């Protein structure tokens, strides 16, 4: 939203990531850390696809992400057949849902780390200034030398990664993933 755009597909990115990571750990017996890396990559790819539609095909962010919301939800239904993926191994669940110290769960630490990274980017780095500049006036930002396309790509990729992390945390909390996850 800072860049003057919007991503309506975050709930579906959240769902697809949970489904893929659950399938990797349950069906294929993948190592949980490797499954998390796959989940982050899924979020980045889905975010990059949104960035492609908006930057290269010049679609309005609302329309592009409304379309990818439907596309990603459809993929989630096709992959699962509408049936939740259950029985996620404890080894995965403990990564995001385990207690670290004094009752603090690991997902709290993950949330704080993501918040700190976002805060540093937005308030301490030039790229954060670029994000605000694009949201304020994209044409003026472009004339000021900001690489608008690259910056918007990175914003959508970061958004996808954040949605993926949320999906993986919810998977750890619930122990299952389904195509309807992330719906309002």
Region spans (language model):
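Single transmembrane alpha-helix segments in multi-pass membrane proteins
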Residues: 1-28, 52-59
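Hydrophobic alpha-helical segments embedded in the membrane of multi-pass proteins
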Residues: 12, 16, 45-48, 112-116, ...
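Hydrophobic alpha-helical transmembrane segments
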Residues: 12-16, 33-41, 63, 108-113, ...
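Membrane-interface helix caps of multi-pass small-molecule transporters
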Residues: 23, 28, 45-57, 75-79, ...
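Alpha-helical transmembrane segments within multi-pass membrane transporters and channels
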Residues: 29-69
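Transmembrane helix-bundle core of multi-pass membrane transporters
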Residues: 57, 61-127, 151-154, 173-182
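Transmembrane alpha-helices
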Residues: 63, 147-171
């Amino acid at each position: 939203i800072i860049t003057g755009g919007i991503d309506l597909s975050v709930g579906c990115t959240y769902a697809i990531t949970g489904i893929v990571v659950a399938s990797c750990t349950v069906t294929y017996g993948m190592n949980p850390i490797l499954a998390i890396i796959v989940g982050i990559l899924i979020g980045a790819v889905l975010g990059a696809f949104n960035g492609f539609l908006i930057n290269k095909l010049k679609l309005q962010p609302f329309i592009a992400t409304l379309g990818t919301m439907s596309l990603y939800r459809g993929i989630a239904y096709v992959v699962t057949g509408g049936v939740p993926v259950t029985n996620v191994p404890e080894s995965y669940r403990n990564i995001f849902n385990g207690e670290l110290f004094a009752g603090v769960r690991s997902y709290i630490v993950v949330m704080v780390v993501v918040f700190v990274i976002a805060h540093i980017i937005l308030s301490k780095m030039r790229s954060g200034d670029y994000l605000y500049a694009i949201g304020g006036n994209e044409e003026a930002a472009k004339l000021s030398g900001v690489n608008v396309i690259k910056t918007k790509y990175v914003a959508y990729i970061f958004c996808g990664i954040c949605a993926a992390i949320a999906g993986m945390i919810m998977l750890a909390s619930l122990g299952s993933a389904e195509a309807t996850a992330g719906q309002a």
